[in-house]
């Protein structure tokens, strides 16, 4: 009880909706919800319950991204933080499969309409067609060289 509990209670339905919207945009069709103590409940289409750890690394990455992007939205809604920059470090370098890369790229394209989105990756050559601009860093004689394409 108290002010913090009331704030959480007010924003929790919005958070759960946003998380599920982002998961859907990334073609991950589960029902995700957080309770007032931030315990998650994840249900499949057939309403079987799953724990976070039972998902593949790529599926966990989608869940993590949905939560991350939701927190950004909540901060904007609350007027406590509004930032037009999103920096994602090595998000494409780990566990997203080809479809996950495509789905995340679509979400980032939409976000880039109102935000400056920067993706740091070691797989630049595989992603050049996914972004409108790239900035490349290459180490030459112990100095970083920058080129833009």
Model-flagged regions — what are they?
Residues 73, 90-93, 125:
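Catalytic acidic motif of RecA-like/P-loop NTPases
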Residues 11, 37, 108:
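Catalytic phosphate/metal-binding cores of nucleic-acid and nucleotide-processing enzymes, i.e., regions
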Residues 29-60:
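ABC-fold ATPase nucleotide-binding domain signature/coupling loops
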Residues 1-31, 47, 82:
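Charged, surface-exposed helical/loop "interaction arms" that form contiguous linear patches used
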Residues 99-149:
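C-terminal lobe/lid and adjacent interdomain/linker elements of RecA-like ASCE P-loop ATPase modules
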Residues 57-87:
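GG-anchored amphipathic helix commonly corresponding to the ABC/SMC/Rad50 NBD signature/C-loop
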Residues 78, 82-83, 91, 95-106:
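Conserved D-loop/post-Walker B switch-helix segment of ABC ATPase nucleotide-binding domains
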Residues 25, 32-33, 55, 76-81, ...:
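Conserved catalytic network of the ASCE P-loop NTPase/AAA+ motor domain
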């Amino acid at each position: 009880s108290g002010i913090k509990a009331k704030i959480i209670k007010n924003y929790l339905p919005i958070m759960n909706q946003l998380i599920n919207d982002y998961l859907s945009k990334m073609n991950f069709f589960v029902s995700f919800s957080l309770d007032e103590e931030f315990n998650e409940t994840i249900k499949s289409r057939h309403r079987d319950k799953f724990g976070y750890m039972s998902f593949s690394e790529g599926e966990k990455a989608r869940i993590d991204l949905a939560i991350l992007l939701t927190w950004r939205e909540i901060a904007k809604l609350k007027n406590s933080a509004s930032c037009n920059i999103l920096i994602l470090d090595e998000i494409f370098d780990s566990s997203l499969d080809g479809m996950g890369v495509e789905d995340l790229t679509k979400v980032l394209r939409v976000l880039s309409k109102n935000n400056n989105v920067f993706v740091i990756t070691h797989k630049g050559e595989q992603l050049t067609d996914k972004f409108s601009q790239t900035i490349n860093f290459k180490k030459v004689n112990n100095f970083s060289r920058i080129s833009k394409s």
